[in-house]
Regions:
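Catalytic cores of RNA-modifying enzymes
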Residues: 1-225, 229, 260, 271, ...
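C-terminal lobe and adjacent flexible extensions of AdoMet/dcAdoMet transferase-like proteins
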Residues: 209, 228-287
Length: 287
């Protein structure tokens, strides 16, 4: 039975092991059972699932995952948390493996092949806010076989992931997320649901992976280089933004001609284009 998820039990475990929070790991442990249940429900965990948990901490959410999933692999970077997980909070579960590693250095494709025969898995995480984007983009770009990713992130980041063209939150992250997945904000989470309290509000967002991207492009890496260049200097026109990006090696004439072919103004900005329009522009400009 899950025993964590409230302040009292969390404090007891931390005191028992003299655990000190490491600021460099961005540690904020969940202490609200309603939020934990909401995450499990949003992730649609079943007894068929292998779940990868990134940053289990003291095992608060891991206990819930173990009770709902077939198997859980929990990857934790902080070696001081491993004894708590293995000897205490997860000792009662036989369907969990704890790996002391940096998720960004782990070969997840090999791990999924070995543990799940290459079949699609689910990812659940209460992510350190300073490293949210590299972790999510790493999962997308390495093409790990995934059904969905359900993560606790900074509210502002969740809004950016879900944003559409023309909004202030719309940018390169929004487009990358929509290329790979369908985002859904399942819950907003206040600061008092964590220990220690973060300085900002949080949100649970589920990213349901597309079986195939919604747009077809000649060169995926060129598409994302184009998108990044379009938002590097938000207030510049697309023509100026793209011709200033050395990695693209595009002339003003090339960009203007492509935009004209698409029926777009030479003064249009990146924030006005949909994913479909970026894909079309990428295909016109890819060499």
């Amino acid at each position: 039975m899950a025993t964590l998820g409230n302040p009292q039990n969390t404090i007891e475990i931390l005191k028992k092991y003299d655990f000190m929070f490491q600021k460099r790991f961005g540690q904020n442990f969940l202490i609200d059972t309603h939020v934990l249940e909401k995450i499990i429900k949003s992730a649609e965990i079943t007894k068929e699932d292998l779940v990868l948990e990134i940053g289990p901490g003291i095992g608060t959410m891991t206990q819930y995952l173990c009770e709902n999933a077939r198997e859980v692999i929990a990857v934790e970077i902080d070696k001081n948390l491993i004894p708590i997980l293995e000897k205490d909070t997860l000792a009662q579960y036989d369907n969990v493996t704890v790996i002391n590693e940096d998720i960004l250095k782990l070969d997840l494709n090999a791990l999924v092949q070995e543990r799940n025969g290459g079949k699609r898995i689910k990812v659940v995480a209460n992510l350190p806010y300073y490293i949210t984007t590299p972790i999510i983009m790493g999962l997308f770009e390495s093409h790990v076989p995934l059904k969905n990713i359900t993560v606790m992130v900074q509210k502002e980041v969740a809004d950016r992931m879900q944003a559409g063209p023309g909004s202030k939150d719309y940018g390169a992250l929004s487009l990358a997320v929509h290329y790979y997945a369908t985002p859904y904000i399942a819950a907003n989470v206040p600061q008092n649901c964590f220990m220690p309290r973060p300085n900002v509000g949080s949100a649970v967002i589920r990213l349901t992976l597309h079986e195939e991207p919604p747009v077809k492009v000649k060169d995926e890496s060129f598409l994302f280089a184009l998108i990044r260049a379009s938002f590097n200097q938000r207030r510049k026109t697309l023509v100026n933004g793209l011709t200033n990006a050395a990695e693209l090696a595009l002339s003003k004439e090339e960009v203007q001609t492509a935009l004209e072919e698409m029926g777009l103004s030479a003064t249009v900005r990146g924030e006005a284009l949909t994913l479909e329009q970026f894909a079309e522009l990428s295909n016109l400009l890819a060499k």
